[in-house]
């Protein structure tokens, strides 16, 4: 299915509803706060969580396409690696191993996050302006961003990243799991196929497209 990027978040038509796809939520399709609808500028917007996806899902941001299937989805030239799948828990989502700002760990990759957030972000990275954000209950807030180098499976890329702890202290609406969340910039740099059952990701770096 084709999607439209609105504020760096994929918007699709699903079950006859306009939805933004959020791999940080375990629901199928749910209604959302009217304030969030206003933030995106889309009336009657819903959220589609990972419960709406089948066993295999391909995210292809360069072509604005999401494919989900019960059958394996090929990715030509892709490499495979294990990933952690968490569903029906406090922090549902998908985690992969990467290095963010020199810190190696398991990080959530989240289609519902326009920007990335980690805890205790170093101020050594160059500032990159202010991001306009909205919490999931619809409260607007702003977040200072920094340009942070990352590496995933030997492939370098860069993200716009904020400090989750600082934002949570200023306005208690930045719900970021301890591992941190990597948003749009990951998907802009890698086309991926996720196997939710076996906990495996096949990926191709954008430089190889």
Where are each of the predicted segments found?
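Pepsin/retropepsin-fold aspartyl endopeptidases
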Residues: 1-209
């Amino acid at each position: 299915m084709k999607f439209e990027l609105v504020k760096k978040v994929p918007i699709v038509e699903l079950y006859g509803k306009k939805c933004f796809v959020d791999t940080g939520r375990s629901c199928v399709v749910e209604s959302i706060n009217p304030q969030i609808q206003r933030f995106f500028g889309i009336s009657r917007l819903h959220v589609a969580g990972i419960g709406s996806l089948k066993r295999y899902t391909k995210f292809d941001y360069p072509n604005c396409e999401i494919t989900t299937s019960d059958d394996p989805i090929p990715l030509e030239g892709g490499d495979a690696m294990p990933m952690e799948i968490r569903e029906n828990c406090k922090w549902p989502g998908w985690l992969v191993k990467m290095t963010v700002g020199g810190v190696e760990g398991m990080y959530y990759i989240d289609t519902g996050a326009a920007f990335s957030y980690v805890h205790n972000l170093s101020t050594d990275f160059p500032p990159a302006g202010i991001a306009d954000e909205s919490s999931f209950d619809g409260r607007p807030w702003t977040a200072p961003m920094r340009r942070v180098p990352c590496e995933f499976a030997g492939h370098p890329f860069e993200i716009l990243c904020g400090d989750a702890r600082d934002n949570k202290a200023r306005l208690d609406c930045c719900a970021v799991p301890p591992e941190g969340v990597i948003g749009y910039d990951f998907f802009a740099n890698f086309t991926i196929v996720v196997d939710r059952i076996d906990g495996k990701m096949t990926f191709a770096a954008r430089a190889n497209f």
